[in-house]
């Protein structure tokens, strides 16, 4: 468990940039320390925020799990990234990001080093992904400027989430990056997913049931509309 702050009421959007940078430095250290253990091949950094996401401890915190095998979802992602890289000698997510930056209508936030967007395959109403602009395959490769830019975009995105329904916005978020198996993994690109459940208000959430559970997920609003709504939200937290 990684506590974000000594204060029980201080979540990411209400923290100072320097304090979010400290969290990122902790993530870097844990990724390195755990990854250096011989039998650890995957380090998963994530946060479950809010009781609706199953968070039983209200103190703002994240978690880190480490294991010898690759989780099924990560292994599937890696296989797709490797396949694209072997065929094109290019990074799939870098090419994807370039296409999104040209199209622009699914972009939520862009700064010098990172982009937050709503991916076209998103299934949650306000699902987003943060992708590094430079080819970085793990969090320990960040420069000092990239650490700051990452802290800024984390604060801005989570602030927009809170401002949307004037509530402490629940979500599950997590970082996907290169495995810690000692291989170079040029196919990987650092990115972070946010999966928030809220749909129309602070009390109305999307349910994955019925056809969506048995057949295929359905979108309640388009990725473009979702990105536009988030983009319009202020970078200043509604409590201020």
Report the location of each language-model feature.
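HIT superfamily nucleotide-processing domains
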Residues: 1-240
